[in-house]
Amino acid sequence: MAKGAREKIKLVSTANTGHFYTTDKNKRNMPGKMEIKKFDPVVRQHVLYKEAKIK
């Protein structure tokens, strides 16, 4: 069976609150690290989230 193109990732807040989102991405279409602005409920603001590996 073939390996899937999608990989599970964790998006960690850059506000150092410890909050994170989990999602998946297509590693063929997006080979680099994902960065996206999302809402951090701890600081109640939109902040930058950076990709990290799920352990």
UniProtKB/Swiss-Prot annotation:
Family assignment from sequence similarity: Belongs to the bacterial ribosomal protein bL33 family.
Keyword Nucleotide-binding listed: no
Residues spanning the membrane: none
Originating species: Aliivibrio salmonicida (strain LFI1238) (Vibrio salmonicida (strain LFI1238))
Gene Ontology CC entries for this record: cytosolic large ribosomal subunit
GO MF annotation terms: structural constituent of ribosome
Top-level taxon in the UniProt lineage: Bacteria
UniProt keyword annotations, A-Z: Ribonucleoprotein, Ribosomal protein
Gene Ontology annotations of biological process type: translation
Stored PANTHER family: 54S RIBOSOMAL PROTEIN L39, MITOCHONDRIAL, LARGE RIBOSOMAL SUBUNIT PROTEIN BL33M
Gene3D superfamilies per record: Ribosomal protein L33
The protein, known as: Large ribosomal subunit protein bL33
